[in-house]
């Protein structure tokens, strides 16, 4: 059985790998010249199942108003006049309740924990190397109010059986010695010892090589134009003016997925959250982080690779704009100087931006659609790296009609209740272009 995977980021590549392991004949198509060239290229590098949390949370609407007035705010909104942007923000606001937050976080943690287990198994079986570390994640709280507010997250961690540790200032210095000199500005921390780090782009490149050895074909520089359909089946995909056919189709196009689905009558509430990162060469390993640090105030992660620090985070709701905002670089540099002033050479840092495909409830869309042979693996937001292996393996099981190792409840598009409207056959969607 032939499967055509659209998109070669970490999600599409993981999907292809796990499908090939199940014996499918897999072809991956992407517009870029190699895998992981867009959102997967320079993300923060953290694999943090326990910190899998939706942006839509109680109190966020009021915080967002305050953030609009701050220079180093973690969230910025640039209104584009796009109706989809307004609808997405309205849906997000509806998820900012305690009850919805608990449901959404449970779904995210469920998939993230499974994904980490799949990654551990993959690493043990294959020895795949991607500058990984398994030294946990430490979330820093600069105020007592932030520390107190972590109680709701801890409740979900306990419910999900995720190990955690609350740290005072001395405890922070114990797990992250380079923070000893600045611990006075911190109120405490929450540490998840089972979290990991790694270079997502390097991992995806290595995984693609392994997939090729299993028979997967990668085709790069291809213009994915539209899906061709009739009734409840996909007939093929128009690629560079030619109709490509398969038995099953997987859409893993990140933020560009909804525009490809709209002509089919499928409303996928995925919208780009623009994020930024700095990659900083380490000058003094003893003064750099040992693993991943999350700065709760600025919603930024600082991650240690072998000889580099990756600083990433923030979110701009600004459509598909990929311009580099110098103010965001200023914020990232400020945070590095604040916490690790002697760890790296900021003058040699590389600045990057990418579009994370976010759903209004934070949970990705993984699973079947109203079309019998079309499957989605998209909407992972800031957690594509964390959820990649689990999402790929879960989707492969669903396509193979095998019982998944975790519950898939609440993960597919049917949770939005509008999985398909009547669509006209042959309507074009020339969206996956630059």
UniProtKB/Swiss-Prot annotation:
GO terms for molecular function: D-amino-acid dehydrogenase activity. Its EC number is 1.4.99.-. One of its GO terms (biological process) is D-alanine catabolic process. InterPro entries: DadA, FAD-dep_OxRdtase, FAD/NAD-bd_sf. Gene3D superfamilies: D-Amino Acid Oxidase, subunit A, domain 2, FAD/NAD(P)-binding domain. Its cofactor is FAD. Pathway: Amino-acid degradation; D-alanine degradation; NH(3) and pyruvate from D-alanine: step 1/1. Keywords: FAD, Flavoprotein, Oxidoreductase. GO terms for cellular component: cytoplasm; plasma membrane. FAD binds at residues 3-17. It catalyses: a D-alpha-amino acid + A + H2O = a 2-oxocarboxylate + AH2 + NH4(+). Oxidative deamination of D-amino acids. Belongs to the DadA oxidoreductase family. This is D-amino acid dehydrogenase. The lineage of its organism: Bacteria, Pseudomonadati, Pseudomonadota, Gammaproteobacteria, Pseudomonadales.
């Amino acid at each position: 059985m032939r499967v055509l995977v659209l998109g070669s980021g970490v999600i599409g590549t993981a999907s292809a790998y796990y499908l090939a392991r199940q014996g499918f004949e897999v072809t991956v198509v992407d517009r870029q010249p190699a895998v992981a060239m867009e959102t997967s290229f320079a993300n923060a590098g953290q694999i943090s199942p326990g910190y899998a949390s939706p942006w839509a949370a109680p109190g966020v609407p009021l915080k967002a108003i305050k953030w609009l007035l701050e220079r180093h705010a973690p969230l910025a909104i640039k209104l584009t006049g796009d109706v989809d942007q307004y609808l997405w923000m309205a849906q997000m606001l509806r998820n900012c309740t305690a009850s919805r937050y608990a449901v959404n976080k449970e779904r995210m943690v469920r998939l993230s924990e499974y994904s980490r287990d799949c990654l551990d198994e993959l690493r043990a079986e294959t020895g795949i190397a991607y500058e990984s570390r398994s030294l946990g994640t430490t979330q820093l709280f600069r105020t007592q109010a932030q520390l107190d507010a972590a109680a709701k997250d801890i409740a979900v961690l306990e419910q999900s059986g995720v190990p955690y540790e609350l740290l005072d200032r001395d405890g922070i210095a114990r797990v992250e010695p380079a923070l000893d000199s600045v611990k006075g500005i911190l109120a405490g921390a929450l540490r998840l010892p089972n979290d990991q780090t790694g270079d997502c782009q390097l991992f995806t490149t290595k995984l693609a090589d392994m997939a090729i050895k299993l028979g997967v074909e990668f085709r790069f520089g291809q213009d994915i134009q539209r899906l061709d359909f009739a009734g409840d089946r996909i007939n093929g995909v128009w690629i560079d003016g030619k109709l490509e056919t398969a038995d099953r189709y997987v859409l893993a196009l990140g933020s560009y997925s909804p525009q490809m689905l709209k002509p089919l009558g499928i409303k996928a509430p995925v919208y780009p959250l623009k994020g930024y990162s700095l990659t900083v060469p380490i000058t003094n390993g003893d003064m750099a982080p040992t693993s991943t640090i999350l700065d709760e105030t600025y919603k930024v992660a600082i991650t240690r690779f072998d000889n580099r620090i990756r600083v990433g985070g923030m979110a701009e709701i600004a459509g598909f704009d990929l311009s580099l905002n110098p103010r965001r670089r200023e914020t990232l540099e400020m945070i590095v100087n604040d916490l690790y002033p002697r760890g790296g050479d900021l003058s040699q840092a590389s600045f990057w931006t990418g579009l994370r495909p976010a759903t209004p409830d934070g949970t990705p869309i993984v699973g079947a659609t109203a079309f019998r042979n079309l499957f989605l693996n998209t909407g992972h937001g800031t957690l594509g790296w964390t959820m990649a292996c689990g999402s790929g393996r879960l989707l492969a099981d669903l396509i193979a009609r095998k019982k998944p190792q975790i519950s898939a409840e609440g993960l597919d598009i049917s949770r939005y209740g509008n999985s398909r409207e009547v669509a006209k056959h042959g309507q074009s969607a020339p969206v996956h272009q630059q």
